UniProtKB/Swiss-Prot annotation:
Its main location: nucleus. It is an enzyme of class 3 (hydrolase). Residues 24-87, 94-153, 165-193, 402-411, 984-1007 have a biased composition (Basic and acidic residues). The lineage of its organism: Eukaryota, Fungi, Dikarya, Ascomycota, Pezizomycotina. GO terms for cellular component: nucleus. A motif (DEAD box) lies at residues 732-735. Residues 8-20, 219-234 have a biased composition (Low complexity). This is Pre-mRNA-processing ATP-dependent RNA helicase prp5. InterPro entries: DEAD/DEAH_box_helicase_dom, Helicase_ATP-bd, Helicase_C-like, P-loop_NTPase, PRP5/DDX46/KHDC4_KH, RNA-helicase_DEAD-box_CS, RNA_helicase_DEAD_Q_motif. It comes from Aspergillus fumigatus (strain ATCC MYA-4609 / CBS 101355 / FGSC A1100 / Af293). It is found in: Nucleus. ATP-dependent RNA helicase involved spliceosome assembly and in nuclear splicing. Catalyzes an ATP-dependent conformational change of U2 snRNP. Bridges U1 and U2 snRNPs and enables stable U2 snRNP association with intron RNA. Keywords: ATP-binding, Helicase, Hydrolase, mRNA processing, mRNA splicing, Nucleotide-binding, Nucleus. A motif (Q motif) lies at residues 575-603.
Length: 1211
């Protein structure tokens, strides 16, 4: 509560202080005998001391200035600037600290500082907020009139009169009389209307006599009558604020729209200009101490948006100021009520500018005990105009008429509620027909004007002519009626227990499972497709090569690094670019790039590819394999017609890594501009929307990774791109493409390309097991091998050292120091390979501490980081790069002179590719490998690579090789297979099968192509899997006879399930001892048969005396966590309880996927729904199934959006 004295806090509503703050001098003018003597500690100054002779002249001069401004004050609103001028000149003699307080309060208190004490006695005797407001308002106007006798004991000096005040006063009185006549006519019309409502008067009077309550409504004063001092008398009628609002407002011609402004009559505007505009009504923020303390009626006003909070206390009458339209004040007097009357709590009130609030309607059955509180809730609230509230009798008659209309409306709604079909057709809501009166009593409606039909509803009802028009214009919020869920569990109007059918649960679980599965593309039937013919053969052998004999061709291949070919009709290798049959534009680009002569692989591969043959090319790293398949592709594409709208690419290049795809795309760019071609690089990690936009614009060449290509083919139902025009396919690093998880994706893409395509495979390594797999997608291929299938280039110096783990980092620093100590290697690059992502980040941190600028790259980083890191490394921004094997293929850096295998590679091909990052295009390089004593398994492949490249194997490495081979002979170790396939396609197949079985058990995917064993297993456990998805509603008696645990019997797979009552002990049980023994034995067998098993419809503890008449169970153990949370959190359960009146209990224990409860253990987590009617249980189950569906779909969606995690930790 606000403090007394010179506090800055405003006075509370209803206090005897003015709502505006006073200066200290004004407060001192009051005598100590006034009612609010809380400031009695201040000294009082009499008028004689205040207006003594020495300052009387100045006072009169100031009054004359006030009189000169009276005309402006009457015609226009008060101007704060004018008041500030006059008030600033008048200062209190008190120079205390309240000067700031006095200055700040002047904008909020417009009472003139020149008024005398003429009305002081009147304010002292009459504590009415309305009279105090009017006396302050008319203080300055009556200052110049003849002085009146005062009730105060001390006289004051009379003020000079102004000649124009009488005329203005007469004019205002004339306007007032005209306004009164208009209001009198309005009241007579309302009385005639109220007379028609006399039928309900007797009923309501009888209710009033029974209740013994007499709430009173004060008649609002005429806002422009300053002399009215009558206190309204209470009446013995119902307090109906709706009727007050309706009577106070002008006769409505159109429905009032919430939030619009209400026009103020001209007479009200005239009086508003001279009334108090800053008499604030402070909202009472004190909460009720108990239910019998107070009730609140919030009366919002329109233009000035001040919320009046009228508080009705049980012990005293507190008077409040209600501001509205600046028309003065209104007295609201409330009669005393008994302390037993309960009040209606409306919660925390939030007052907002230019917003009207609506309050809920209390339950109707409480009307006898709480008549005043029920009527205090504003049910149908129009915009308020506080001009005239009428007399008490008129208000009472209007209240009774409104109550009669409300009674008729509720009766008609109760009749409609009895018809279930009509209710379903009109609103689609589920009616609780068992307790219609209770449902209606809990209904809370918020309408703008209940008795008036909304124009839109009326128009729609005229069109339909089947449903009666709804008499609501605002939003309706009901407790008893909950929105009917969508008809996803059977027929829309079916009310039986088909709510938990099999097919619908399978539908949304299948949707969730589909979201988790990878995108799939359909298999194309090539026999039904009509493909355009295309030409493969573009190569014409030059005459000098045609005259060459086979012996001369073999000698030439031997000179070109020992080219080995295998196949039928292999073309002879070319010696110059001009012999390849290329176009002028291509030759110009080759010349600009500085390619003088073809490399070994290029001289043999280009003629073979341009002859239209499938080719397998194996060559050492850095030998120019990329140009070997790009140049024939450009010639191949240029021979075909241009692309049309929505046609896919002609050339498709697939790579295993994103970095390699980026590098191939970069190598294409010099040729694209010259040949007027377009290429798109599509790889994972980059935004797919950009790649889709480029593909829709059209591209003859697509460089991609297999996973992203499948995504693009499946995007937008295959409308983004297609493979119908693909005739040239390249698999770069082909051994890796057919390894591990790449093989299914690659074969899926290859199956959708026309069979007569031309396929080219290139790699630096090609194990024999991968070779057999790759040949399945080729047709009579030519195999070209240059320098061995898995051989390190002879330009690379290989160093292998056997070291302990703790000495490797020191040795690495020594190698880097030796490299950069030579000025010639100032621009050299160093690439360090590790085996794990964590090791890459750890080594990065250690090298940074030692002063080496470096970066790391691995599969756990974002693609944009990987791309920028490689670009910076090539540009020389940092000289050292730490990487996993993700950078072992395709990375081409010309200044790379040192490769360090900090962690030894685990097979030969990985070692060849790592070492091949240096010594490219004829340059020299160094590859250093660290081996530890525990890595003797890897020493075999490293020694083999050294021997194949013609280098000596170090003695410590040879000892490790011999030791490992002896262990293999003794059976203690197993020799590792060559190639990346060492991790095993079989292992991945087993993991995929295991994941598929888990999904099948959990979600019942029902995938096709299952083997016989899976089919038999599915047939044996069909009922058990069905019970994991949805619960059935089944009686305890019927379920007790189930002989086999875990396999419920009597379940209709068509979804027609019946709800039975919970088993009750029969009243007239037989007293035969043998019957009792037999019943006990049967009960024991039934309990033993279901020990630890949760079957649908049979909760273990549903036999108690408090068990509902009907029940159902819903197992949620195997659903995702989000789905379980959706049906068990307090908020959702509370909503279902309020809507259906059932009891919902979470029972059982949670078991992870694949784990079943043992004997004597709790069943799996489930929900027990109990209710007194079948309809209540059904509605609760439908809502729970809906929440379960939403949670399952949300969990699947979040899993699909989750980023792929890596094997490293952010430090």
């Amino acid at each position: 509560m606000a403090r007394h004295g010179d506090t800055r806090s405003p006075s509370p509503v209803g206090s005897t202080y003015s709502s505006s703050r006073r200066s200290r001098r004004d407060d001192d003018r009051y005598e100590k005998s006034r009612r609010d003597d809380l400031r009695s500690y201040r000294r009082s100054r009499s008028p004689e001391r205040r207006y003594r002779d020495r300052d009387r002249d100045s006072y009169r001069r100031r009054d004359r200035s006030v009189d000169r401004r009276d005309d402006h004050r009457d015609e226009d609103s008060y101007r704060s600037s004018r008041r500030d001028r006059s008030r600033d000149r008048r200062r209190s003699r008190d120079r205390g600290d309240d000067r700031d307080h006095r200055r700040k309060s002047r904008e909020r208190d417009y009472r003139s500082r020149r008024d005398d004490s003429r009305d002081r006695a009147r304010r002292r005797t009459d504590d009415s907020a309305d009279l105090k407001h009017k006396s302050r308002r008319d203080d300055s106007r009556t200052r110049n009139l003849d002085s009146k006798p005062r009730e105060a004991s001390k006289p004051s000096t009379p003020a000079p009169t102004a000649p124009t005040e009488d005329e203005k006063r007469a004019e205002r009185l004339a306007k007032l009389e005209a306004w009164k006549q208009k209001q009198a006519a309005e009241r007579e019309r309302k009385q005639r209307e109220a007379a028609a409502a006399g039928g309900a008067r007797s009923i309501l009077e009888e209710i009033d006599r029974k209740s013994g309550l007499s709430p009173a409504v004060g008649s609002p004063q005429s806002p422009a009558t300053p002399t009215t001092d009558a206190t309204p008398t209470p009446y013995s009628g119902k307090f109906d604020p709706k009727a007050i609002v309706r009577n106070a407002a002008p006769a409505p011609s159109t429905p009032a729209v919430l939030g619009n402004d209400v026009a103020v009559p001209q007479s009200a505007k005239a009086s508003a200009s001279s009334s108090s505009m800053n008499n604030h009504v402070q909202a009472n923020k004190h909460p009720a101490a108990n239910s019998t303390t107070s009730c609140k009626l919030y009366i919002p006003t329109i233009r000035f948006l001040q919320i009046a909070n009228v508080t009705c206390t049980a012990t005293s009458t507190v008077k409040r100021n209600v501001g509205g339209f600046g028309l003065g004040a209104k007295q609201v007097a409330d009669a005393e009520k008994s302390s037993a009357v309960k009040t209606l709590g409306f919660g925390e009130e939030e007052s907002k500018r230019k917003k009207l609030e609506r309050l809920p309607t209390p339950p109707l059955e409480d009307a006898k005990d709480d008549m005043g509180a029920v009527d205090a809730a504003v049910e149908d609230e129009d915009d308020v105009d506080m001009q005239d509230g009428g007399t008490e009798e008129e208000n009472a008659a209007a209240a009774r008429a409104a109550a009669e209309r409300r009674e008729e409306r509720l009766q008609s709604e109760a009749l409609r509620a009895q018809s279930k079909e009509a209710a379903l057709q009109s609103n689609g809501d589920v009616e609780m027909n068992d307790v219609p009166h209770q449902a209606e009593s809990e209904k809370m409606e918020v309408d703008a004007a209940e008795e008036e039909v909304d124009p839109l509803d009326a128009f729609m009802s005229e069109l339909a002519e089947t449903a009666p028009p709804k008499k609501t214009t605002g939003a309706r919020f009901t407790k008893a009626k909950d929105q009917q869920p969508e008809a996803m569990f059977g027929d829309e109007h079916d009310v039986d227990l088909t709510a938990v059918g099999e097919g619908d649960a399978d539908d949304f679980l299948a949707i969730a499972n589909k979201a988790k599965k990878k995108k799939d593309i359909p298999t194309v039937d090539h026999e039904k497709m009509e493909y355009e013919p295309f030409r493969k053969k573009f190569y014409t052998e030059p005459s000098n090569l045609a005259e060459m004999t086979d012996e001369e061709a073999a000698s030439l291949r031997l000179e070109l690094d020992g080219i080995k070919v295998r196949g039928v009709d292999v073309p002879k290798p070319v010696m110059k670019w001009s012999q390849c049959g290329l176009g002028v534009q291509t030759l110009d680009v080759i010349q600009k790039l500085g390619y003088e002569n073809p490399t070994s692989i290029q001289s043999q591969a280009i003629p073979a590819i341009m002859s239209g043959r499938d080719v397998i090319g194996v060559a050492k790293t850095g030998s120019g394999k990329t140009i070997a398949f790009l140049i024939p592709m450009f010639r191949h594409i240029r021979d075909q017609r241009p692309l049309e709208n929505m046609e896919g690419p002609i050339g498709l290049i697939m790579t295993p890594t994103r970095e390699l795809a980026t590098q191939i795309h970069k190598d294409c760019k010099p040729f694209l501009k010259a040949l007027n071609l377009r290429a798109v690089c599509a790889y994972g990690g980059a935004p797919i929307k950009d790649q889709i936009a480029e593909l829709k614009r059209g591209a003859e060449i697509v460089v991609c990774t297999p996973g992203r290509m499948i995504d693009l083919l499946a995007a937008n139902a295959g409308r983004v791109t297609n493979l119908r025009r693909v005739t040239y396919v390249v698999l770069d690093e082909a051994d890796r493409m057919f390894d591990m998880g790449f093989e299914p994706q690659v074969m899926k893409i290859m199956a959708n390309i026309r069979p007569d395509r031309q396929t080219v495979l290139f790699s630096a390594t090609f194990p024999r097991n991968m070779e057999a797999l790759a040949r399945k997608s080729l047709t009579k291929p030519i195999e070209i091998v240059v320098g061995g299938k898995s051989v390190v280039a002879p330009e690379i110096t290989q160093i292998v050292e056997v070291r302990n783990e703790d000495t490797k980092f020191v040795r690495l620093l020594e190698i880097l120091g030796n490299l950069y100590s030579d000025d010639a290697n100032e621009d050299a690059r160093a690439l360090i390979f590790v085996d794990r992502q964590e090791a890459a980040d750890t080594l990065l941190r250690e090298l940074m501490r030692k002063g080496y600028p470096c970066m790391s790259i691995h599969g756990g980083k974002d693609q944009i980081d990987r791309d920028s890191t490689i670009e910076d490394f090539k540009a020389g921004i940092f000289p050292v790069l730490i990487a996993t094997s993700v950078a072992a293929r395709g990375l081409d850096v010309k200044q790379l002179k040192l490769v360090v295998n900090y962690d030894a590679p685990n097979h030969l091909e990985d070692y060849v590719h790592r070492a091949g990052r240096t010594g490219r295009a004829g340059n020299t390089g160094t590859a250093v490998t660290f081996l530890t004593e525990e890595q003797e398994r890897y020493s075999v492949d490293i020694a083999k690579a050294l021997r194949q490249s013609g280098q000596k194997v170090p003695e410590p490495v040879q000892k490790m090789v011999d030791s490992f081979l002896e262990k293999v002979k003794a059976g203690k170790e197993k020799a590792s297979a060559s190639g990346f396939g060492g991790k095993g396609l079989e292992r991945l197949d087993q993991e995929r099968d295991a994941a598929r079985m888990r999904e099948r058990r959990t979600y019942k995917t029902g995938e096709e192509g299952e083997d016989e064993e899976d089919k038999e297993d599915k047939a044996e456990k069909a009922d058990e899997r069905f019970s994991k998805i949805v619960s059935s509603v089944q009686s305890a008696a019927a379920a007790a006879t189930t002989p086999l645990p875990g396999v419920p019997k009597g379940i209709d797979l068509d979804g027609k399930i019946t709800v039975h009552r919970t088993e009750k002990d029969p009243a007239g049980a037989s007293k035969n001892p043998l019957d009792k023994v037999g019943s006990a034995v049967a009960d024991i067998h039934a309990r033993l048969s279901r020990a630890g098993v949760m079957r649908s419809g049979v909760p273990i503890d549903n036999r108690g005396p408090d068990a509902g008449a009907f029940h159902a169970t819903l197992e949620i153990n195997d659903f995702p966590q989000k789905a379980r949370w959706a049906v068990t959190n307090r908020t959702n359960v509370a909503k279902i309880l309020e809507a259906t009146g059932t009891s919902i209990t979470t029972k059982g224990s949670f078991y992870p996927a694949g784990k079943e409860p043992g004997p004597g253990e709790n069943p799996k987590l489930y929900i027990l729904v109990e209710g007194e009617t079948e309809l209540a249980v059904t509605n609760a189950m439908r809502e729970l199934m809906r929440l379960l569906k939403e949670g399952t779909l949300a969990a699947a969606d979040s899993d699909a959006r989750a980023p792929v995690g890596g094997r490293y930790n952010v430090v």
